A protein has these predicted regions:
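Active-site rim/adjacent substrate-binding subdomains
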Residues: 1-149, 154-194
Length: 194
């Protein structure tokens, strides 16, 4: 089932999400719905707070980025994480961010039609559980690391716009206000703050 994406301005997006265990009700269905919602919304990642659940869960698929690149894009870039991954992250915690920060143009399903260059570390080591609650600690790099860090921010109550300068945020204020009021048209289901 495709779930509505929570829009900027909803308090759940600013809440630090809580850990869960294997007894969380209907978790398998929620994960399935999150995958369906993410793909229907043309996203590469989706965190539970974006579907109004304050839990430490996100899904991401960096493989689709590489699958959609043409040969010229592939030859021009340095993509150590190709061909990408498709993964569920439960109770994720960043262990370490490694390497120089690099800019990449990011957007967010909860903040539609706003894209900005955001600086993030080249690599990230994350401790997490998969959908079977098996523990992992892995290091990811490139675009995959970036998506993980973006989604991780969501479960920590942060948004990509928080990384912008105060001046840039001020320049975006009207657009952000429009999003929070529902004065925006998107091609996926959204729910706006009351």
């Amino acid at each position: 089932m495709i779930l509505p994406i929570v829009a900027y301005g909803n308090p759940v997006l600013r809440k630090v999400a809580r850990d869960i265990d294997e007894n969380y009700p209907d978790l398998a269905k929620l994960i399935e719905d999150m995958w369906e919602t993410m793909y229907a919304s043309h996203g590469v990642g989706l965190a539970a707070p974006q579907v109004n659940k304050d839990i430490r869960l996100f899904v991401m698929d960096s493989a689709q980025i590489f699958a959609n690149m043409d040969d010229e894009e592939k030859s021009e870039g340095n993509y150590p994480d190709a061909p990408g991954i498709k993964q569920v992250f439960i109770n994720a915690h960043v262990v370490e961010e490694i390497g120089d920060d690099w800019a990449y143009n990011e957007g967010c399903l909860s903040i539609p039609k706003i894209r900005e260059d955001i600086y993030r570390a080249e690599e990230v080591t994350v401790s997490y559980q998969d959908e079977n609650f098996k523990h992992h600690t892995k290091t990811f790099d490139g675009v995959t690391a970036r998506i993980i860090l973006h989604e991780y921010d969501h479960i920590d109550g942060k948004l990509f716009i928080d990384k912008l300068s105060p001046l840039k945020r001020k320049l975006l204020r009207r657009k952000l206000d429009d999003i929070s009021k529902g004065n925006i048209s998107v091609d996926y289901k959204m729910v706006f703050p009351k």
